[in-house]
């Protein structure tokens, strides 16, 4: 009898494991159907959407809308934060928006003081942007990636772990504030000017995945913007906003909030906006301070570096060629690895996380290309892409969290490391980094080709 029970139990275990586990797929991405589908769709859209244009008047407007919930809410960011509910507000959270209109095209660059722009929010925006005469391709969504901000915006098991108990009112709140910020910024538009700037701040960033074995992305990318008598900046940087640990239960923007507040309080700037850049594998270099001392240190040090170049003035120009695009991104079947060679089957991932479409955002502002990706994108890979863009006489900003989420995309050479980013959060294969790099290079090449054709036609 015992032998029969043992055999039956073993059969049940084998069936269970076969239904839930699968070998890690290491098929090269170029051999899979999703790759061909992505390239085809992207090339189609690139051909159909040649909407770059320059008008005779440049208008720019800023808006800042409070996103702080009226009651205590879950905090998003750390799976091991228990409980998830905030105790109080340390500093308020906001949606910051810049609207730019060159007389032919209009765009909105948005940053929310959130962990990510949740996919549920993007679904709402797709429905409601039409009501205010906007469309999703005209919107560049980004987040500060603070790990101590509003949660409760993601249904499903993974959403609960990362962002706390789901409540539909939170995605609705975020979407409504984004829509309001776009309308306000549009109403605030005045004759404007713009400038792109870049500085290196290696002292505030480290490779948190492999330390000195890897590359860091030290570059802070900076849009300087004028709107009438007002002047603002929008900064992009790669260090994770994790100065505040999982022990913190107070709502806060972390160091991005310190950066923005310091710039407005200590310079002539009226607005200072921050967005996460390519943050995968990149952590803040905080020194030995504790919690809010750390966020204060990183935010202030970053602000002082930017203030130095602001003293000399930015090289503004009032002519702006604008192109915008949002292209579909297809990936292989998702897998959550439990070891180097074994993972949960895709159906478990889809049950726990949900199924959402993924897209890449692209803005072209003269010789600046802005790429918004639906993931924690590798700072190591970003450095390679910056250099590639410069070889084409283009500047490049890469921002994570554009309204979708595909986990982490680290450098492929770290895929088999037994660490959090590549083991638990790299869901789409051993060569996903190379795939993302190829897609971004395709977009850069298209812009470069169009620029060369335009220059030739104007000769």
Enumerate the predicted regions with their spans.
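Anionic-ligand-binding alpha/beta catalytic cores of soluble enzymes and soluble regulatory domains
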Residues: 302-305, 309
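Conserved beta-alpha junction segments in alpha/beta enzyme cores
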Residues: 2-9, 15-142, 149-270, 275-279, ...
